[in-house]
Amino acid sequence: MALQVLIAHTGLRLEVDTAQFSILDDLKTWVSKKTSIPPQHIVALNPHGRTVKITNLHTEKEIFVYDIRISSPGNTNLITPIPLPKRYAVPNAPNTIDDVQSITSWQELYKDRRNWAMRLVEDSGQMSSATLARYSEIDVIIKCLDAAVANLEISIKQIEPKYNDLKKWVAPALEEHGNLVERWEQYLDLAKSTPVSPSMVKFMTGREINKARPTLEDLIELDTAKKAGKLAPTAHRRFSDKANQLGNTASQMYQSLESLIANFETLMSRSALSHSTDSAQLLEDIEAVVKQMDSDYRAALGYGNTQRDVAQASKTASVHTEHLVPTLKKRVKEMEELLHYGTDARNSVASESAKFMRHVTEITSLHSNVKSQINVLNQSEDDMTTFDYLRLIHQLPYMYAAFVAEAVRRREWVDKVKTDSSTLANEMALFQDEESKRRRKWQKMIGSMYGPDLDTNVMGLEVNLLGEDTPWPALTKEDLTDFIQILQEQPVDQTVLDDIVKLVQELDSPTKQQSKRLKAFKNGSIHEAALGRSGLMIRGDDDLLQSLQEDKGKLENKLKTAESRVRRLEDLLHRQSQASRPGNLFQPQGSQQRERVNSASSVRSSRFDDRRRSSEGIDPLMRRITQLENELREEKQRSVNLQQELTTQSNNHEDVKGQHEDLKAQHEDLKGQMAEINTTKQDLLENMEALEREFVEERKNLEIEIKTLKARLEDTEDEIEQFDESRQHEKAGLVVRVEELEAELEQVNKQRQDDALKAQGQVEFLRKETRIQREQQEALEQQIQSAQEEVQNVSRKLSVAEEALDDHWQALTRLFSELSPDGTIPDNVVDLSNLLLTQAGTLVEKSRNSEADIELLKTQVEHFSSAISELREQVSQKDAKLSEDEMTVIHLRENIAEEQAKVSALEQELADGREQLTELRAKLSDGETGPEALQTRLEDEEKKVMTLTEEVASKQSHVGSLEEELRMFQEKVESLQGKISHMNSHYEHRDEKTKDLTQRLYSQNDRMCRLLERVGYAVTRKDGEMTVNKIPRAERNAQNLADSTDPSASIRKSGTLSRVLGDSVDLELLYWFNNSDMQAEDEKYEEFMNNLGKFDMELFSETVYRRIKEVEHMARKWQKEARSYRERAHILQKDSHEKIAFKHFREGDLALFLPTRNQQAGAWAAFNVGFPHYFLREQDAHRLRHREWLVARISRIQERVVDLSKSLQPSSETESINDEENDNPFQLSDGLHWYLIDALEDKPGAPSTPGMGKSTVAANTVEATANIHAHGVGGKGKSRESVTSIEGINKTLSKSLESRRSSTNSKKALPFQLGGTTLLKNSALASETNSLRAHNADTPSGTSPTQGGHLTSTNASLGQKNQRVDGPIRQPSDESSTQGGGAKADEQPRSVVQREDSVESPTRRSVVWDSLWSVDYNYESGSRRWLGG
């Protein structure tokens, strides 16, 4: 069945036959070829939102394939929108005609227009198909989104029960922890002030108490309690933070899920799929218009060249021009618009699907975070340990009370057991004494006549108490009551006090057996089944006696009620009998008196019996009840007799009245019985309901336990997967690091060798120069001496270098001891360097991180210093402005002072003028001057005074305005200073926050880039977009080697990181806020945000998520494969232990040894295929002379080589050679490698080696069934050579043995140069020791039984991969000999001999031994027979 594969991000729909896929990776490979998605980035889901499995792949109809790179923030380029099609230019319809009067011209016009319309229909059909394809892609994308959302819901629902259970547990735990944190000191004070019993404290703690009055405090360790109290607030806060963080993350996850579902529903509601059929309808309209034009063209072909036809053609053409052609153009334009609309809708849905997938990835990360936080919260054992000890302090009173109650219970139990045992022993002693007396009496009367003498040994009973408990302190209930009173006087927790009171109440409650005895009395009867098992346990139990006495009182009350009722009935009956016979004169008075006396006596006897019953107990009460019932029946019978007598004498009215009374009494009896039945029924129903409730509760508990166990199983599987993933990561990292260190070490060694060679070359060169200079003139002796000095310097350098090497070794050892003081220093320099490089790797990584941080800090310090300088400049500018304002104020003040001085001067002048005026007036009055001159001067002075007064007024007003302006400037300066200080502090805080935020973004991008590089990805940027590519392992190793060989690898790596970070975020742009210019700051901020946005967070998340999923998939896959391989290995190991090996012989294998043709040499070879020269070392236990084959288990294999040169030595030397040390006991060719096998018989009882037609050991019979397929049918006269005859069997075995002996694998030895070849050439041993070989490839396949027909039921199927066969022989469990007489031989089932092909050549079969492979051996008692199959 074809499977539809839907691609999520492209909307592509593929079909494939699932029969060609055996594993899920094959499907991913096929999808990768079709869609160019890497197989490791493919995720497949079914329509239900679950992961596709290979087992369910053949039943699925649709699967959804996702590219996990899409969910990464930076992989937006993976979703390539489909470009909008070019605008379709509708060509103009043909509208030219050569001759309007010619019908042919009109027909040509119609033809051209028809062809034009046909082209438009074809183009419209293509646009309609493209539109439908776009809508199909939209449908696929929405379906894939639905499956992804369903998968997310399934994942979240899996952890929801665990989260809800954790919420239920966390809230009360936090409350309890808070209570313990706040009140643990109060609980400790309570323990200090609460006295307890010294013996119990010693018993509980196991140590001596030296205090005169021990308290509860002595039960705990005070230091541990104080330490727990100090750690409790921190633990509580940490636990509370974890719980709050989990709650916030979980709420965020659920809110994000609800938002995702709401957005998906919104996307579904506004989906463009409702317009998916518009293009098909529009295409039908276009085709209808074109059909009309085609029909008009066909009609025009039938027109003649008449005026009427020409007019009709012209009219039809005008209709086309006015209606059909514009309509067709309009419809084609609408089709184009539909195509554009569908393409836009598809592109928008694709982009929104990418956003949805990123949202799904975020929620998935929140889900994993919640899961990890749940595990962390469940595993906070340290916090729980702290609170456990504080809880112990809180529960100290209850713990002490529980121990005291247990001591009381154990003491009471011991007393009860001792009392009951002594009572039982005394009673049995009485019975034994009574039996002894009876026996003596019988012996005296009867037994003395016959039989033995008097037997005084009477069987008795001895009671021994075993298993005495450890002596507990002798405490009583009064001690526990006193302890409760002490606690009530102190501020103790009420819940703890209630629990202690409950312990005291439980001491008074009866045991289970006692409760059964109490419940045995029901409805006035005793249920013996409920009485319990032992009657001794009641004796001496005061509580039980008290409860029995209460039941006795209740029964007595019931009895009194019944007796009073009986007395009333008797009285009524007596009165009725007396009143009904007033005229009976013959009734004797004595009878009445007797009846009254009987009645009174019955009353007295009932009272007497009542008193006696109350004194005697329950049994007399029951007998009394029975007696009263009997008397009641007798009275009833008597009343019936009396009524019968009265019926003869009384009237019908009294008779009816008596019957009514009887019926009434019977009715009351029936009501009582019904009440008892109803009570019993209610008891049964209550019991059934109680059982049902218990069953329901038990079922709920079991279901809850099942859920918890399933959750624990899932958690355990997740932990196993995480552990496997971490192990794989560590292993991969260690392998890479080891390779890097090995390469670096090789480079160092090469460099050291190069340096040594270089120094050696220099020495040689200097020596040559010295020799040449010695041969030159004597004038050059100084140069020779200098050269010698240089040689000495070089030698000193060499010695210094050697000393440096020693120092280097010592430095390495010291460095290793400092790096790992606990480790052992290796002796080898290579091992030491490897260990140091391993330690140095971590240090280099840390140094790289610290260098990056130092560079970041340096840049921050520089920018901080520049920012400080700028701030200082701003402050200086502000100070300059303030100084300018102050100078302005000073100038204003100086101006005011000047003006005031001018005003004072003017006032002084005014005063002087006034004085002069007064003087002039005085002079004028005195007549000293002339009137005219004085008048003129007076006027001048008055004018001058007027002007001065005006100037004074104006100056005063100007001074007032200046003072007001000065005051305003002062207020402005103060307000500006306050604002400047506030703004400075505000901007300082803002700058700190901005710096922190910018640096965090910078460091976050830095760490994420490092993470991508460390997990094997390369980050590249092109045209403002970030791309993450996976580095192949070969390139990664090459890069690591290059880095390790270069001493400056760390510098280049840090430089690479700096370049990456420089590409992502410019370092200068980090300090965009340090610009004084607002416009420049805005530009740098925009540039910073643009550069920061180049880091695609979605691509990063998708890459990391994909990497994690790949590792998880590989871990699961390898885990499953390891499990399957381990099981297969166990199975194969178990099977191979019992199978006969025919190649690759090892110790412990089971082998079949067959004799060679030369029996005198004792050569027994192991049956093999392609592995010759394995000979058996003969032992006495093998008894090879009487065997025809031997199945034995190999214990040792010794490889030997034939050396015939030893045989050429003198005879004295050859005779001294031990037989066991002889390397050629079987006369093999020189230089031949052969193997001597020591083997122990695994299954003894192999048959002897008789001749053909003779029997083997009498107790064994071999039944061989040969099934030889595909052999040619012989002709006439060949019946004797049939495989079923003796001759055929003999011939087959001879051929097989000859084929084994003539194997070419045994002829690979070198020729013997000294005649050894001639000696052994004609020897039979040269061919006897050769093993079997496979048949040539040209052998017909039909000759092999494995390629013939089907094997019989007795033959096993042949394998092609296993290299072992089952043992051909199963020995009988018991061999019977002819001399043993009537020994019965057990009949053994057949053991199938399986033939398996060689691994090296599965197509090559052995023809010679095919018949042997199909032979089954069966042992039977009697004789040996061969059956042809």
UniProtKB/Swiss-Prot annotation:
Q: One GO cellular component from the entry?
A: phagophore assembly site membrane
Superkingdom of origin: Eukaryota
> What's one GO MF term for it?
molecular adaptor activity
Residue stretches in coiled coil:
540-579, 616-808, 842-985, 1106-1135
> Where mainly located?
membrane
Location of this chain's protein in the cell: Preautophagosomal structure membrane; Vacuole membrane
**Annotated stretches, region: Disordered:** 574-622, 1205-1224, 1333-1405
Pfam families given for it? Answer: ATG11 (PF10377), ATG17_like (PF04108)
Q: Where is the composition biased (Polar residues)?
A: 575-592, 1206-1215, 1333-1362
Record text on subunit structure and interactions: Homodimer and potential homooligomers. Interacts with ATG1 kinase and the ATG19 and ATG34 cargo protein transporters. Interacts with ATG9, ATG17 and ATG20.
Instruction: Sum up the protein's function in the record's words.
Output: Involved in cytoplasm to vacuole transport (Cvt), pexophagy, mitophagy and nucleophagy. Recruits mitochondria for their selective degradation via autophagy (mitophagy) during starvation, through its interaction with ATG32. Works as scaffold proteins that recruit ATG proteins to the pre-autophagosome (PAS), the site of vesicle/autophagosome formation. Required for ATG9 anterograde transport from the mitochondria to the PAS. Also recruits the ATG19-prAPE1 complex to the PAS. Required for the Cvt vesicles completion.
Can you say what this protein is called? Autophagy-related protein 11
Q: What is the lineage of its organism?
A: Eukaryota, Fungi, Dikarya, Ascomycota, Pezizomycotina
